[in-house]
């Protein structure tokens, strides 16, 4: 059974990408297909009117990035990023007139190269070797020490919020943070028994069983 809501606590373990965040601001205009496209993933199954895709690209797609067929026909946009960081999945919200059920297992989807982010951007940064950290000077008399900048935030979330933890994409619709992998999603994963993608943090209660 897969639930749409994820707890707000640290947890994590996956990209919980989603639709959070404000939608204000300027809307990007459709500039047509790019000059070249790169293979992004293959169709697994349809779920709730969207396509669940297994990524075949070592990079991570932007949210709302346009997705194309090999002939550069636009079919939709990236809606959510799911799964563990070593096996990324994502969903495509189809464009008007496109049916998610019209595709079959293994069909390939493509993306513009500028709509990709390196996975390393979302991994914890290695600690510097011992002895390379400079010592902090003691404050002079009468002066208070300046506050530090705080720990690295990390995160790949479309909306700010409480979600997430360390080491991966945290919450989804409004949740933030980096949580150890892509958390949750739609439908069941192609491998591994009953487990499934949960839709990532956000709207609360589950929708029952897919």
From Swiss-Prot:
Q: Which Pfam families match?
A: Gar1 (PF04410)
Give the span(s) annotated as RGG-box 2: 141-205
CC terms in the record's Gene Ontology section: box H/ACA snoRNP complex
Q: Where is the composition biased (Gly residues)?
A: 8-25, 144-210
SUPFAM superfamilies under this entry?
Answer: Translation proteins
Q: Where is this region: Disordered?
A: 1-32, 121-210
Which Gene3D superfamilies does the entry mention?
Probable tRNA pseudouridine synthase domain
Coarsely, its chief localization is nucleus
- Keywords for the protein's UniProt record, in alphabetical order: Nucleus, Repeat, Ribonucleoprotein, Ribosome biogenesis, RNA-binding, rRNA processing
Q: Name one GO molecular function term.
A: box H/ACA snoRNA binding
In residue numbers, the region (RGG-box 1) covers 4-25
Please indicate if the UniProt record lists tRNA processing as a keyword. no
Compartments reported by the entry = Nucleus, Nucleolus
Q: Which InterPro entries match?
A: Gar1/Naf1_Cbf5-bd_sf (IPR038664), H/ACA_rnp_Gar1/Naf1 (IPR007504), Transl_B-barrel_sf (IPR009000)
The record describes its quaternary structure and partners as: Component of the small nucleolar ribonucleoprotein particles containing H/ACA-type snoRNAs (H/ACA snoRNPs).
Stated role? Non-catalytic component of the H/ACA small nucleolar ribonucleoprotein (H/ACA snoRNP), which catalyzes pseudouridylation of rRNA and is required for ribosome biogenesis. This involves the isomerization of uridine such that the ribose is subsequently attached to C5, instead of the normal N1. Pseudouridine ('psi') residues may serve to stabilize the conformation of rRNAs. The H/ACA snoRNP complex also mediates pseudouridylation of other types of RNAs. The H/ACA snoRNP complex mediates pseudouridylation at position 93 in U2 snRNA.
- Similarity field: Belongs to the GAR1 family.
Q: What is this protein called?
A: H/ACA ribonucleoprotein complex subunit GAR1
Q: Which species does this protein come from?
A: Chaetomium globosum (strain ATCC 6205 / CBS 148.51 / DSM 1962 / NBRC 6347 / NRRL 1970) (Soil fungus)
The gene for this chain is GAR1
């Amino acid at each position: 059974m897969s639930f749409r809501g994820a707890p707000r606590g640290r947890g994590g373990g996956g990209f919980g990408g989603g639709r959070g965040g404000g939608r204000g601001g300027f809307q990007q205009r459709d500039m047509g297909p790019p000059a070249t496209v790169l293979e992004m993933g293959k169709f697994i199954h349809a779920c709730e009117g969207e396509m669940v895709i297994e990524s075949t690209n070592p990079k991570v797609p932007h949210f709302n990035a346009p997705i194309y067929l090999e002939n550069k026909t636009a079919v939709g946009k990236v809606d959510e990023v799911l799964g563990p960081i070593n096996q990324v999945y994502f969903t495509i919200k189809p464009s008007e007139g496109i049916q998610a059920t019209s595709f079959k297992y293994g069909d390939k989807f493509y993306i513009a190269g500028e709509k990709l982010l390196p996975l390393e951007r979302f991994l914890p940064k290695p600690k510097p070797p011992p002895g390379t950290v400079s010592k902090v000077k003691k404050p002079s008399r009468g002066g208070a020490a300046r506050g530090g900048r705080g720990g690295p935030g990390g995160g790949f979330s479309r909306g700010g919020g409480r979600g997430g933890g360390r080491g991966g994409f945290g919450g989804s619709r409004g949740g933030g943070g980096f949580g150890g992998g892509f958390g949750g999603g739609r439908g069941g994963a192609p491998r591994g028994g009953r487990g499934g993608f949960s839709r990532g943090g956000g709207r609360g209660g589950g929708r029952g069983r897919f």
